[in-house]
Amino acid sequence: MRMEHIYKFQHWLFFIGLGVLLSLSLSVKANDFEGSNDRRSIALKARSFVSINENRTALSRKLLLSPDIGDGTNRIGQDCSKDDIVLFQGSTNPLPSGVPSYTVEIFNSCVSDCNIAEIHVSCGWFSSVRLVNPRVFRRLDYDDCLVNDGQPLGPGQSLSFQYANSFSYPLSVASVSCF
């Protein structure tokens, strides 16, 4: 059941990302063609748009294939980073007392064999009316919360918890340790 939840979450994440990329692409194209009435200028802009994207694709493939580029863009086979931890937060049904409730999902999006531990989240003065399992998420100090009791989160693994407060806390990944 847990793996099924992870796969559904990964599919959901993929389709949202795809939708965002598609909408950005369409808005860029629409802005390029705006104000152009003549067919020749539209054709030239369309050709330049396509060639820019072809160059980006070629560059991306080159970065993936060349292991000697040391600028950090080639991440295949290298250590993980805090960017591999994706944190989602959304509102859920309020408590019977009317206090707003929120669900947080923390996901290791690393595609290679990387276990990420000691995940620290910037969380302000995080507190909750609803009890949050301290092994899953707990505040250590101001703006420092620990995820999964410091234990590793494997590639593709996620965990979630719910909290209740009069407002949602802005949560972001502060630091991680890679294994």
From Swiss-Prot:
This is TPD1 protein homolog 1. PANTHER family: PROTEIN TAPETUM DETERMINANT 1-LIKE-RELATED, TPD1 PROTEIN HOMOLOG 1. GO terms for biological process: response to heat. The gene is TDL1. Residues 1-30 form the signal peptide. The keyword Signal applies. InterPro entries: TPD1. Keywords: Signal. It comes from the Eukaryota.
